[in-house]
Amino acid sequence: MYRINLTTFTLLLVLAVGSLMSESLHPSDGAINDLYEYLLQREYAAPVSYADHQIKRKAVRSPSLRLRFGRRSDPSVPLRPEEDELIDQKAIRAPQLRLRFGRNDPLWTSFNENALLEENFEKRAPSQRLRWGRSNLFGNLVNQFQQDDVMQQKTIRAPQLRLRFGRTDPSWAMYNEHQLTTGQQAQPANEASEKRAPTQRLRWGRSDPALAKDSSEDKALDVEESENTNADDK
């Protein structure tokens, strides 16, 4: 009797465990449908998290966004008249300063607006150029106030002492002008065709102005000596 009761209890236990295992392997259709509906809802705050992976569904996009095949709007939704008016009334933008790769400089947006105003300004006067194309600031101010006088009363400048590579020594400019005016006053009209006295040449064909005066004095002494000799011979 005891053996029969033990065998019956064992069979009942095996059947109970088998039924539980079969239910866990084959869930009901209701649980699957609930999970499917939960995943297909329109929006939710957090993604559905599982132990081995994650599933996240995006919210439904509005029809104004770009759809398939490059369409900007849903063909079933009509366009608003405000957008058409804005497209028709869109003005052509002014040309802007282009940077590399077609970018625009935001600092130069008002450049074209002021371009017409800058054209009305007077052009700058020609300035005295220094070495390497630099301009003399003092010369610019003088040209701005005396532009007409300089252009009308411009005369041929006197020969100046040239330095190396064609540069001019400004300290000799006034000296050469003074020498030129005094020489023109001292020379008589009949000696205009007389050749100048040979002077000692410096480097690059320059003449020493200090020796020019000495050569003229020597020539005058030679003339006086020749006259004295002619008088003695007579």
Swiss-Prot record:
Give me the ranges of the annotated region Disordered.
Answer: 181-234
UniProt keyword list:
Amidation, Cleavage on pair of basic residues, Neuropeptide, Secreted, Signal
Point out the propeptide residues: 23-56, 207-234
- Major place of residence: secreted
* Claim: Secreted is one of the keywords in the record: yes
Q: Which GO terms describe its biological process?
A: neuropeptide signaling pathway; regulation of multicellular organism growth; regulation of response to food
Q: Kindly state one GO CC term assigned in the UniProt record.
A: extracellular region
Q: Can you say what this protein is called?
A: Short neuropeptide F
Picking any one GO molecular function of the record gives: neuropeptide hormone activity
Q: Which organism is it from?
A: Anopheles gambiae
Ranges annotated as biased composition (Polar residues): 181-190
Tissue range of expression? Answer: Expressed in all body parts of larva, pupae and adults.
Identify the stretch annotated as signal peptide in this record. Answer: 1-22
